[in-house]
Amino acid sequence: MRTEYCGQLRLSHVGQQVTLCGWVNRRRDLGSLIFIDMRDREGIVQVFFDPDRADALKLASELRNEFCIQVTGTVRARDAKNVNADMATGEIEVLASSLTIINRADSLPLDANHVNTEEARLKYRYLDLRRPEMAQRLKTRAKITSLVRRFMDDHGFLDIETPMLTKATPEGARDYLVPSRVHKGKFYALPQSPQLFKQLLMMSGFDRYYQIVKCFRDEDLRADRQPEFTQIDVEISFMTALQVREVMEALVRHLWLEVKGVDLGDFPVMTFAEAERRYGSDKPDLRNPMELVDVADLLKSVEFAVFAGPANDPKGRVAALRVPGGAQLSRKQIDDYGNFVKIYGAKGLAYIKVNERAKGLDGINSPVAKFLTADIVDAILERTGAQDGDMIFFGADNKKVVADALGALRLKLGKDLSLTDEDKWAPLWVIDFPMFEDDGEGGLTAMHHPFTAPRDMTASELKTAPEEAVANAYDMVINGYEVGGGSVRIHNGEMQQTVFGILGINEQEQREKFGFLLDALKYGTPPHAGLAFGLDRLTMLLTGTDNIRDVIAFPKTTAAACLMTEAPSFANQAALTELGIQVVKKAENN
């Protein structure tokens, strides 16, 4: 039906007869001439109808936005004065000789000339996806997956599928459960990741595995989370953590070079402890120049309990955040930032405005100045590198609250004051995470997952001091987004059972949930490691959007619903009966 795509026509096509298929993007009726912008997935081209082709001109008068049409015509060069430099096809146009209206369009629920609500866009997603910017994002996503497959094939990886219907395992989020009709009362789980299957593939001798795979997590959603998402999943045998990072870094550098024309260079490496200390986050955005600076040692003797208390507490921390040019902030803005940090557990936000540094105590403005000596102020200004016109904010509390509050404030200030370089790419690796963290109930939980190996510890050493264990894990971070994470896996049965025990999984539960894994570990398991990238998040970064729903063809809302198909929906009673399921309605409060 077509010979060319609209958006691919260029000066090289001048004089050729072409047949195009697509949609009316815009129509302009000048009486004796009718112009339309005709659109398909590749872009837009201008088509015009003149009186010499009367039948086509008459039919063109009926055209409206989003009519699906076929046009045959001749490509012509535009006059120099009519060239549109903003269009890829702006040097040419098509003189139509025939027009077929394939399908007409009703009055549109989406307005191409206005900003539509996300609710409307998701409800009429098939119309939303016709927009050039949406089509371009999905084309970029397709290019990324193609580049990944070629790279992995070139590096000896095998694309192997793993099951979608599997067994529930504890991986940090709730599972989506699928009832079995054959095995009444039993349920499959949709995989949160192919973690155990890819480890079993290593045990099976397939030493380089990858898969672009759907995963499912029943968790609370954010702008960059979906209940079903796509991973670039990788596992490798007989490689160290460093070697795995080198291969995966090469993949990401390849993607950025091919998609953006940007050489990311070598990725810096930072420990978890350093990232938390300097940036208040384990996924620091290095485009932002501000850093947290420890000042507790300078404030231990001040007569101000808000500072002195945490400064003298081994579990406490007092840190400063210097904001270049921040002295311009108004009292209201400072109060707003004080309320902002309370979201993260902080009780308030002390500050020093640096007016004239050379004047020391007399050159600052601060509600806590009366508690500080000139020497302490000078030391704080020196350590933070403060200059005239800067602002210094303080966090004083337990270590987690200070990191969370000042880390979030750092990001917000970077955006609000345009301190973050939006034109820069800042990748890094974060390594050496704690293996376990407090679950809030007196126990421990795995910071990554229970199949991550510790660094340089035996099973007996781990059992003795689990709080001191460092995971042989690594996250790739780009511009403050964790785009991928992985680890060296446990390949020893004793170590795996030790980790399960630390996590409170008794031997009976270990056999019930992981018996197949523990058995497999008995038969010559190779050392192996892996990583998984979030394809959705990578695409989000490479297309310049901050909403993950913009890079998924048919995403869910933040309430995990599809507005277009109205999923989830109630099941047919006959189907429920066959599955042995009874839906219990929640009692309404009187």
Curated annotation (Swiss-Prot):
It catalyses: tRNA(Asp) + L-aspartate + ATP = L-aspartyl-tRNA(Asp) + AMP + diphosphate. It is found in: Cytoplasm. Residues 195-198 are annotated as: Aspartate. Disulfide bonds: none annotated. GO terms for biological process: aspartyl-tRNA aminoacylation. Its EC number is 6.1.1.12. Keywords: Aminoacyl-tRNA synthetase, ATP-binding, Cytoplasm, Ligase, Nucleotide-binding, Protein biosynthesis. Its main location: cytoplasm. GO terms for cellular component: cytoplasm. ATP binds at R217, D218, E219, Q226, E482, G534, L535, D536, R537. Homodimer. Catalyzes the attachment of L-aspartate to tRNA(Asp) in a two-step reaction: L-aspartate is first activated by ATP to form Asp-AMP and then transferred to the acceptor end of tRNA(Asp). This is Aspartate--tRNA ligase. It comes from Salmonella choleraesuis (strain SC-B67). The lineage of its organism: Bacteria, Pseudomonadati, Pseudomonadota, Gammaproteobacteria, Enterobacterales. The gene is aspS.
